[in-house]
Amino acid sequence: MSFNFRIGQGYDVHAFGPGDHVMLGGVRVAHSHGVLAHSDGDVVLHALCDAMLGALALGDIGRHFPPSDARWKDADSAQFLQHCDGLLRERGWRVGNADITVICERPKVGPHAVAMRERIADLLAIELDAVSVKATTSEQLGFTGRGEGIAAQAAVLLGRIAAPHQ
């Protein structure tokens, strides 16, 4: 049986390290720390990539962009998202909507949420109202609550747009 919809979910986390900003949803956000990562460490785009890949059982971001590969050192995660979107479209799918939650005490995400939504919608060539970005804290519990890092969760609904390219 074949369905015209697929659901995927993704999660990413990075510890804070030296730096003066974090990348979130393709947007540079000033912060007292950067993140420790092989690429730019954008937890929003990484979680979104994993959700998209998972919906079609295509593995995870680490398989497609292994940290052992020097090509991805300090890479812009927008490249990852566009690659994942290309894989979906090659198979006749596209993102119907994405729902993303950032988990951290700081930086405050709210002031940047619209810019993140706009960037993601632009990268995926979907409507702005198909992208939700929100934030929560962990009430000072765990590594995010202690200000040691940042995490993101993403859920996507994919819709079939065409038969897969042969």
Swiss-Prot record:
Q: Which UniProt keywords apply?
A: Isoprene biosynthesis, Lyase, Metal-binding
Q: Which Pfam families match?
A: YgbB
Q: Where is this site: Transition state stabilizer?
A: 38, 137
Identify the InterPro entries for this entry: MECDP_synthase, MECDP_synthase_CS, MECDP_synthase_sf
Specify the domain of life of the species encoding this protein.
Bacteria
Enzyme Commission code: 4.6.1.12
Question: Which GO BP terms apply?
Answer: isopentenyl diphosphate biosynthetic process, methylerythritol 4-phosphate pathway; terpenoid biosynthetic process
Cofactor binding description: Binds 1 divalent metal cation per subunit.
Which cofactors are required for activity? a divalent metal cation
Complex formation: Homotrimer.
Which family is this sequence assigned to?
Belongs to the IspF family.
This chain's function reads: Involved in the biosynthesis of isopentenyl diphosphate (IPP) and dimethylallyl diphosphate (DMAPP), two major building blocks of isoprenoid compounds. Catalyzes the conversion of 4-diphosphocytidyl-2-C-methyl-D-erythritol 2-phosphate (CDP-ME2P) to 2-C-methyl-D-erythritol 2,4-cyclodiphosphate (ME-CPP) with a corresponding release of cytidine 5-monophosphate (CMP).
The name this protein carries in UniProt is 2-C-methyl-D-erythritol 2,4-cyclodiphosphate synthase
Tell me what organism the protein belongs to. Xanthomonas axonopodis pv. citri (strain 306)
Q: What is the lineage of its organism?
A: Bacteria, Pseudomonadati, Pseudomonadota, Gammaproteobacteria, Lysobacterales
